[in-house]
Amino acid sequence: GALTALITPMNADGTVDFDGLRKNVKFQLEEGIDGLVPLGTTAETPTLDEKAGSEEDKIIEIVFDEVRKFEKTSGKKIPVILGAGSNNTKDAVAYCERAKNAGADAALVVTPYYNKPTKERIYQHFAACSKVGLPIIVYHIPGRTVLNIQTDLLVRIPELPHLAGEKEERGSV
């Protein structure tokens, strides 16, 4: 099915428009979307506060609140794949744990960016996230990460436990 990568609506002062987010989530659900992907790269995550009790936590709370209400009234299961990407492996693991604790169906984990890790470090990044026990989706977007995962590594990554899939944004498969 189709899943919406949710944007994070912002107010003019740069704060998150939580009412706008709630309206957007409700709209997506009422219009029949099959699943939601909050806190991915489309969601302005690098600009959000991520500390406990933060903007990110409030976004997670709103998304799951609306999804649970919709599931209760519609009888339909709505998968939520929570963005858990970071170029810092420790942070990515913590985001995967947060996704698991929130009740997400999977975590979307972007290829580590900026530091240009070796193939082995990329593999270890995804392996560390996989150990959380939540299904993970590898997010391969070389246009943003400046890393193109080579075919030999793409063949190796599926050996990891809890790998659910890959979101491919290379433009050529």
Task: Map each language-model feature to its residues.
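Catalytic alpha/beta core domains of metabolic enzymes, predominantly
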Residues: 131-132, 143-173
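Active-site beta->alpha loop and helix N-cap motifs at the rims of alpha/beta catalytic domains
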Residues: 3-146
